[in-house]
Regions:
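Conserved glycine-rich cofactor-binding loop
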Residues: 11, 18-19, 42
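The beta1-alpha1 cofactor-binding region of Rossmann-like NAD(H)/NADP(H)-dependent oxidoreductases
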Residues: 43, 64-76, 107, 220
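C-terminal substrate-recognition "lid" of short-chain dehydrogenase/reductases
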Residues: 84, 122, 133, 137, ...
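Substrate-binding pocket helix/loop in short-chain dehydrogenase/reductase
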Residues: 101-102, 109-114, 196, 207
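Residue(s) in the substrate-gating loop at a strand-loop-helix junction
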Residues: 145
Length: 250
């Protein structure tokens, strides 16, 4: 018997959905029947992501967008509405790292990470929130990080931004509940991505030793939690952060 596609008919935006965790999320939601819009700065990666999603039988669209620019956020929302008529789920996934010790960190390293990882979430949540308020329904899922809960040396910018995402999730979850808009966060730990692959082997091994499950997580394991939050089974969950980290932070 064919398994029912529980997200059939729903329209999803995944920012930064052209690579890494974002692409894993877009892929799984497409497999589950959703129409998926992915955004990112790299046009070639966007095209490749759209082709992959369409190969799964999903209506898909790639929109070049810079997460730090209000006009790009507004355009992404408008293009999605023009193509699909509504927005049911927003996954705020776009993010960057600019790691450095606190005393050596440049102003630009701080500003770029906060702009992309926190301001970008605010801009997209505000833009999509207006649409969902008119619909009187919606799901917003923010990709946070274990770093936002526990802090990471060499990542004061990233940790601060992701802690801000967790706070934004709590506040907007309470504020938007009146319109039946549920806002939650998923906080991954060490996940197999391009970012993780760039970590020096010695540092990567040291991080892995802190994970009780003694392995690196996979993007699909994060995506499965996003799918839950996007679906009907999470209809009484809002303002929460679900950690996917192999026990790194509990």
């Amino acid at each position: 018997m064919t398994e029912a596609k529980t997200l059939a008919g729903r329209v999803v935006i995944v920012t930064g959905g052209n690579r890494g965790i974002g692409l894993a999320i877009a892929r799984l939601l497409a497999e589950d029947g959703a129409s998926v819009v992915v955004s990112g700065r790299d046009a070639a990666r966007l095209d490749a992501a759209v082709k992959e999603l369409e190969s799964l039988g999903a209506p898909a669209l790639g929109v070049p967008a810079d997460a730090t620019k209000r006009e790009d956020a507004d355009r992404l929302v408008e293009v999605t509405r023009e193509r699909f008529g509504r927005i049911d789920v927003l996954v705020n996934n776009a993010g960057i790292t600019r790691d450095q010790l606190l005393v050596r960190m440049k102003d630009d390293d701080w500003d770029q990470v906060l702009d992309t990882n926190l301001r970008g979430v605010f801009l997209m949540t505000r833009a999509v929130g207006k649409v969902m308020m008119r619909q009187k329904s919606g799901r917003i899922i923010n990709i946070a990080s274990a770093a936002g809960a526990m802090g990471n040396p060499g990542q004061v910018n990233y940790s601060a931004a992701k802690a801000g995402v967790i706070g934004l999730t709590k506040a907007s979850g309470r504020e938007l509940a009146h319109w039946n808009i549920l806002v939650n966060a998923v906080a991954p730990g060490l996940i197999e991505t391009d970012m993780a692959a760039a970590i020096p082997a010695e540092a990567r091994e040291a991080m892995l030793q802190q994970v009780p499950l003694k392995r690196i997580g996979q993007g699909r394991e994060v995506a499965e939690v996003v799918r839950f939050l996007a679906g009907d089974g999470a209809s009484y969950v809002t303002g929460q952060t679900i950690h996917v980290n192999g026990g790194l932070y509990v």
